[in-house]
């Protein structure tokens, strides 16, 4: 289930005061928390009353609106209560094409079952020691 959430910015306005420092107030663009919660609960309780009478239970299948912003308003209040709640978005399902099977590729693998299995051309430069001896280097080219 997916939904869209838009939170309008809070406006800070200075209030006139007799004190030299101005006071700021928060103006929320929507109704108060109490009125918004009562409307959400009344919508929710009418749709889920047949299922349960527990106010902490939410019926996710009975409403066309996403309930997550409403729950956020109840839990954290503040900015969450000023959110616009939009209808749930249903994503279109697209058929997935099966990947084309690639042809098997022949590869040449080195045998790594001996402690001296190295690339002979690079062995003397990288490892030195016995890998620089003529007996080991004779098959390098």
Curated annotation (Swiss-Prot):
Gene induction: Expression is controlled by light and by a circadian clock. Differentially regulated at the level of mRNA stability at different times of day, being a target of the degradation pathway mediated by the downstream (DST) instability determinant and thus following a circadian clock rhythm with highest levels in early afternoon. Rapidly degraded upon illumination; this degradation coincides with the release of the LFNR from the thylakoid membrane.
This protein's name: Light-regulated protein 1, chloroplastic
Presequence positions on this chain: 1-41
Name of the gene encoding the protein in the UniProt record: LIR1
Pfam families: Lir1
PANTHER family cross-referenced by the UniProt entry: LIGHT-REGULATED PROTEIN 1, CHLOROPLASTIC
Key words, A-Z: Chloroplast, Disulfide bond, Membrane, Plastid, Repeat, Thylakoid, Transit peptide
Region (2 X 15 AA approximate repeats): 58-132
Cellular localisation: Plastid, Chloroplast thylakoid membrane; Plastid, Chloroplast envelope; Plastid, Chloroplast stroma
Record's comment on post-translational modification: May form interchain disulfide bonds with LFNR1 and LFNR2.
Record note on disruption phenotype: Slight increase in nonphotochemical quenching (NPQ). Marked decrease in the accumulation of LFNR1 and LFNR2-containing thylakoid protein complexes.
């Amino acid at each position: 289930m997916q939904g869209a959430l838009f939170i309008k910015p809070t406006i800070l306005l200075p209030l006139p005061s007799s004190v030299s420092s101005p006071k700021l107030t928060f103006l929320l663009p929507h109704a108060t928390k109490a009125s918004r919660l009562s409307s959400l609960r009344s919508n929710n309780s009418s749709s889920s009353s047949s299922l349960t009478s527990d106010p902490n239970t939410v019926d996710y299948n009975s409403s066309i609106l996403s309930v997550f912003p409403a729950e956020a308003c109840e839990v954290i209040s503040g900015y969450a209560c000023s959110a616009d709640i939009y209808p749930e978005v249903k994503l279109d399902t697209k058929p997935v094409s099966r990947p084309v099977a690639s042809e098997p590729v022949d590869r040449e693998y080195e045998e790594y079952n001996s402690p001296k299995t190295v690339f002979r051309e690079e062995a003397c430069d990288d490892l030195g020691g016995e890998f620089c001896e003529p007996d080991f280097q004779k098959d390098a080219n």
